[in-house]
UniProtKB/Swiss-Prot annotation:
Chain positions recorded as divinyl chlorophyll a binding sites: M709, Y717
Organism (species): Prochlorococcus marinus (strain MIT 9303)
Gene (name only): psaA
Pfam assignment, any one: PsaA_PsaB
Cellular compartments annotated: Cellular thylakoid membrane
Protein's recorded name: Photosystem I P700 chlorophyll a apoprotein A1
PANTHER family the record matches: OUTER MEMBRANE PROTEIN, OMPA-RELATED, PHOTOSYSTEM I P700 CHLOROPHYLL A APOPROTEIN A1-RELATED
Length: 776
């Protein structure tokens, strides 16, 4: 990557005086009509079928188009606006479906009995069978995205408001799309502007996250929470009275602009009518009715208290706006990221690096791949954390009792997190190859890490072997003992126990904090400081379990160690791809070959699965396998030990009658009692409203199996086949101008892994949906 030098004789100006170049690149739409315009070789057009694959591979590889960091930065920045435009169009579509094709009002009136639907299938050749009865006289496809619950939490009470949001989102899409064009063609930021790290941190922390969170707090306090308080009162059977009028239905709720009337909203939350003077006089307790610290969940909706959520966003806004002011930018005061990072020394005992983190700031501020790798790893991990909070601390009303939606959101956030973490490894590998200068990084933490890579990878390897042999060994033992009829010799809760004592201890610690004054500022005991999944009680909403304690036993410990094994192997593959991206014993010149390189050319025998790209390719399979185990475990565990109906005597009838603890301790149990038994709904879905999932189940299997054709067979076989066919065509003078050529091994693997993941995800989607929607 090269950095453009300033023009000769040009005096450097402060970036604040001239942060952009005007009319940088004229918008030339004719250029976009030429495929491959960004590459001299691709612009010549195809002479073989490899051209189309290279076109796809390089279209967004901005580094290789010009090789100039400033131009690359501008393209990425402009593409961000395009991405935002697509997001707004997608949001507009969701709002529009809610406004025109949904039963949102019907669901809002009776969320415990009416199911969410925002799509109606047109009757072309019998597809209308998929429009099942979701309650209250509405027929459509049941949706499991959680948007109804989210809209309810936002305070949306009608389809009219949804249509207004759909229109607003389209307007925003147009604005940001224009912004992307403007900031590339009309006012393109300079490289120095992109590299003002402290200013960027201020903009993100104060502007985007701080003020964004504060603005959302304002919406929650003034619109969403009063609306939700009225809806909760209706659902609880005790409607509130405002100005002498009983608020009996959602249609009676005042419109958002009417809720700005202090006298009106003060009847819901008196603190809102007390005035802003209490803030400046530090009488903050006057606001304690709409900024609460209740803990636990609202017993009416089974969701976090909306007033707790508002308090949470206000606290984050304060933290972020304060934190965003500690960096040094225009005024020469505050923290310098370069100084902070440069002053950090390595661990003198475990990881001696005489130069510590020196050079790390320059690496991160010159390599967008390195920054992206860090961001993807953090956001991916955050997505996985969100997945676990969706069921343990449900944020939206009536989400916890919509079991298909909870499972769908858990699965979605787990997969998104896994893909992002694999993306982090990919971009870390690219950063190491394209942006890492070995002459600059001498005896700093990066250099020491690369020098210690053999020790790091070998230790990870030993950990993986230990976990793999022992965790699978427990399963092999149990399957063997069960086959021999020796249940007393099995590892189980009723024989040889392997209790997860540490996890149980942590659960008891959290449970013991309920009713204590463990949160700063509270004088009374918290009724539910933590989630009820930690040894709490049963929270029932509409006769269904919203939350209850999740018991842990031998089966959980065994599966936990299977998770540990698969996650460590994924980490091993991805990390090895990064640490050995520049060189290895087999291929010492990898840095010159690039992130991906073919392994089927002259002199390249035996070099497959050596490039950094190949490690991402393999890591994706292990990521998929490890997360499949996670989501299968979650699905079965919740159906067996948590989800179900609450009987009049307080007992719970679970969906699958608690068979998890005894069946999940053998491989055969997983096959028989989970995969086979729970696939009955999808296998018998034909002729019902779930028939679409039956077809998706078959189609997903087909796409998955199709991937194996690319993954199992060698390139040489296909090339020989092609050449035989081409020879026959030449004989008949029918040879095509564009020469057919077999996919390279890298291209074949890319096609293979894409279909493997897509087919597997669709199959799992159909399996989960048909199962829980079929159970009703």
């Amino acid at each position: 990557m090269t950095i453009s030098p300033p023009e000769r004789g040009e005096k450097a100006k402060p970036i604040y005086d001239q942060p952009v170049d005007r009319d940088h690149v004229p918008a030339d739409f004719e250029k976009f009509e030429q495929p491959g315009f960004f590459s001299k070789s691709l612009a010549k057009g195809p002479n073989s079928t490899t051209w189309i694959w290279n076109l796809h591979a390089d279209a967004h590889d901005f580094d290789t188009h010009i090789g100039d960091l400033e131009e690359t930065s501008r393209k990425i920045f402009s593409a961000h606006f395009g991405h935002l435009a697509i997001v707004f169009i997608w949001l507009s579509g969701a709002f529009f479906h809610g406004a025109r094709f949904s039963n949102y009002s019907g669901w809002l009136a009776d969320p415990t009995h009416v199911k969410a639907s925002a799509q109606v299938v047109w009757p072309i050749v019998g597809q209308e069978i998929m429009n099942a009865d979701v309650g209250a006289g509405f027929n459509g496809i049941q949706i499991t995205s959680g948007i109804f619950q989210m809209w309810r939490a936002w305070g949306i009470t009608s389809e009219t408001e949804l249509m207004a949001l759909a229109t607003g989102a389209l307007i925003m899409a147009g604005l940001v799309l224009h912004g992307g064009i403007f900031h590339y063609h009309k006012a393109a930021p300079k490289l120095e502007w992109f590299k003002k790290i402290e200013s960027m941190l201020q903009h993100h922390q104060i502007g985007l996250f701080g003020l964004g969170s504060l603005g959302w707090t304002g919406h929650l306090i003034h619109v969403a929470n009063p609306t939700n308080a009225l809806l909760d009162a209706i659902d609880a059977g005790t409607p509130m009275v405002l100005d002498g009028k009983t608020i009996a239905t959602a249609a009676d709720i005042p419109l958002p602009h009417e809720l700005y009337n202090a006298d009106l909203v003060g009847q819901i939350y008196p603190g809102l009518a007390s005035g802003i003077g209490n803030f400046f006089s530090a009488n903050w307790w006057a606001f304690s009715d709409f900024l609460t610290n209740n803990g636990g969940v609202n017993p009416v909706t089974g969701a976090l208290w909306s007033t707790d959520v508002a308090h949470h966003h206000l606290a984050w806004a304060v933290f972020l706006m304060f934190g965003g002011h500690v960096y040094r930018s225009r005024f020469g005061i505050g923290h310098s990221m370069k100084e902070i990072m440069g002053n950090v020394k390595g661990d003198p005992l475990l990881f001696p690096a005489p130069n510590g983190h020196k050079g790390l700031f320059e690496f991160l501020s010159n390599s967008w791949h390195a920054q992206l790798a860090v961001n993807l790893a953090c956001i991916g991990s955050g997505s996985i954390v969100v997945a676990h909070h969706m069921y343990s601390l449900p944020p939206y009303p009536y989400l916890a009792t919509d079991y298909p939606t909870v499972l769908g959101l858990f699965t979605h956030h787990m997969w998104i997190g896994g893909l992002m973490i694999c993306g982090a490894a990919a971009h870390a590998g690219i950063a190491v190859i394209r942006d890492y200068d070995v002459s600059v990084h001498v005896d700093n933490v990066l250099d020491r890490m690369f020098k210690a890579r053999d020790a790091i990878i070998s230790h990870l390897n030993w950990v993986c072997m230990f976990l793999g042999f022992h965790s699978f060994g427990l399963y092999i033992h149990n399957d063997s003992m069960r086959a021999l009829g020796r249940s007393q010799d099995m590892f189980s809760d009723s024989a040889i126990q392997l209790q997860p004592v540490l996890a149980q201890w942590i659960q008891s610690l959290w449970a013991s904090s309920i009713g204590t004054s463990s949160v700063v500022g509270t004088t009374t005991g918290l009724p539910g400081a933590v989630s009820d999944v930690f040894n709490g009680g049963v929270v029932a909403v509409g006769g269904k379990v919203a939350l209850m304690a999740i018991p842990l036993g031998t089966a959980d410990l065994m599966i936990h160690h299977i998770h540990a094994f698969t996650i460590h192997v994924t980490c091993l593959i991805l990390l090895k791809g990064v640490l050995f991206a520049r060189s290895s014993r087999l291929v010492p010149d990898k840095a010159n070959l690039g992130f991906r390189f073919s392994c089927d050319g002259p002199g390249r025998g035996g070099t497959c699965q050596v490039s950094s790209w190949d490690h991402v390719f393999l890591g994706l399979f292990w990521m998929y396998n490890s997360l499949s185990m996670v989501i299968f475990y979650f699905s079965w565990k919740m159906q067996s030990d948590v989800w179900g109906t609450v009987n009049s005597d307080g007992s719970v009838t679970h969906l699958v009658s608690g068979n998890f603890a005894q069946s999940a301790i053998t491989v055969n149990g997983w096959f028989r009692d989970f995969l086979w038994a729970q696939s009955s709904q999808v296998l018998t879905s034909y002729g019902t409203g779930l028939s679409g999932y039956g077809l998706l189940f078959l189609g997903g299997h087909f796409v998955w199996a199709f991937s194996l054709m690319f993954l199992f067979s060698g390139r040489g076989y296909w090339q020989e086949l092609f050449e035989s066919i081409i020879w026959a065509h030449n004989k008949l003078k029918l040879a095509p101008t564009i020469q057919p050529r077999a996919l390279s091994i890298t291209q074949g693997r890319a096609v293979g892994v894409t279909h493997f993941l897509f087919g597997g995800i669709v199959t799992t989607w159909a399996f989960f949906h048909a199962r829980l929607l079929g159970l009703g």
